[in-house]
Amino acid sequence: MLRIADKTFDSHLFTGTGKFASSQLMVEAIRASGSQLVTLAMKRVDLRQHNDAILAPLIDAGVTLLPNTSGAKTAEEAIFAAQLAREALGTHWLKLEIHPDARWLLPDPVETLKAAEALVKQGFVVLPYCGADPVLCKRLEEVGCAAVMPLGAPIGSNQGLETRAMLEIIIQQATVPVVVDAGIGVPSHATQALEMGADAVLVNTAIAVADDPVMMAQAFRLAVEAGVMARRAVPGTRSSYAQATSPLTGFLEASA
């Protein structure tokens, strides 16, 4: 069970809505993933009507919607988008994204912290997408963010946990949930993140661009479940030396 702010989730896999070939395929994949929290870019939906091709199927699926501010380049733009989302969708939950450079889509740490502090004061449950910077994540936690979402690698790159060393520090020091976001390309990446101690992962591109998105969503569901189970089982410690799994000489002594 994962708790963030005022909500609890059985699944530790969050999903996105971009890059799917159709809204029907998107919903089928989300259902197959078991995800209960789905993020969507406000710039891609028609907020004036709930029969939007993306929004309507998600509402029907009964998932928790996490609007994001993707496309915002400044704190002011992100705050404006957040206010529109709250008014249109009736949710105070928000994934805060501010990335000024469209080529790399890396989060702006200064603007993200500025916006996060303002949005928390306005009553939002803020989940900021941020770099894998332990100092920044601690600052975001201190201003009241409900979770932090450090990247594993650039958005959509499928590179995996390239920031592993920093993620380990973030996880160790955090007192709010840590959701590894961006760069996860295959199910084993998700398993590794959960084994490290992350509370959840957010996956979009890896599922949406697969030849069979529904099957890939199922694979991620199982991978996340395996990661959570492995962490709870408490793996053995790593050793620089070999450790025998059975006596090496006992049978010789017994036969002597």
Curated annotation (Swiss-Prot):
Domain of life: Bacteria
Lineage: Bacteria, Pseudomonadati, Pseudomonadota, Gammaproteobacteria, Enterobacterales
Species for this entry: Citrobacter koseri (strain ATCC BAA-895 / CDC 4225-83 / SGSC4696)
EC number: 2.8.1.10
Gene: thiG
GO molecular function, a single term: thiazole synthase activity
InterPro entries reported for this sequence: Aldolase_TIM, Thiazole_synthase_ThiG, ThiG
Transmembrane segment boundaries: none
Localization annotation: Cytoplasm
The keyword Lyase belongs to this UniProt entry's keyword annotation: no
Protein name as catalogued: Thiazole synthase
Keyword check for Transcription regulation: no
Residues annotated as catalytic: K95 (schiff-base intermediate with dxp)
Family stated for the protein in its record: Belongs to the ThiG family.
A Gene Ontology term for the protein's cellular component: cytoplasm
